[in-house]
Amino acid sequence: NGWIYSYSAKDDRLARFRTDGSQYEWVGEAEIKSGRYYISNGNVVYSVSNDGTTTIKCFNTEKKTTDTLKTFDTTSAWINGLYGNHLLYEVYDAKKEGDVVTGGTMRFYLYNLNSGTDYTLGNDKIEGTVWNDQIFLCDKAGNAELRSLQDPMIVTKEFKLPNALLGNISTSARLVLAVGKNLAFATDGEGSQVKILLMNSEWKELTSFTVN
């Protein structure tokens, strides 16, 4: 008799209902939007962007309370995932000359919901996920590293992916995903095609396919 979460496109709100149909309720505020929330351990973590800012909030489904976790003076901040009580997010720190963006740096952070501790996970990594209980980060060239969830400031392994990541893509697109104990990532295929590789923890290719 657990909960199933579902987003109502008609009402533009997140809801949940009991598996036996005995209870139905809205989850949090209407500001929780489709594609911008993650659920773990009774917490719904989501982002709200408006007026040039991004706010990351947490709704506790048991206490029915909403707390603000982080606020940024940019809309270039994204939640990457919620893993237990660990929140992985990224922020693009843009460099400007006047009102013109001339460059910038992507930074990943790990936030502990229990302690409120925030860890900076280095610069210039454009993709990140939690994979096999470790933090996986990599740059566009495929230079990758693993960090411990318990001590994220320590890099436990550095290596290179067999292929560079897909080029000419929006910074908000996900190019790396953990799939069970395996890792899937997008690379350049032939012409305009995208090649998806699925690798295991020993970096052996399990399968690959192309999409247009």
Question: Which residues does each predicted region cover?
Answer:
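Solenoidal tandem-repeat scaffolds enriched in leucines and small polar residues
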Residues: 37-38, 45-46, 52, 91
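Ankyrin-repeat and related helical/solenoid repeat scaffolds used for protein-protein interactions
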Residues: 167-199
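Residue-level signature of beta-propeller blades and closely related beta-rich strand-turn architectures
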Residues: 10, 50-51, 93, 141, ...
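Repeated scaffold domains used in trafficking and secretory/extracellular systems
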Residues: 1, 31-41, 74-84, 122-134, ...
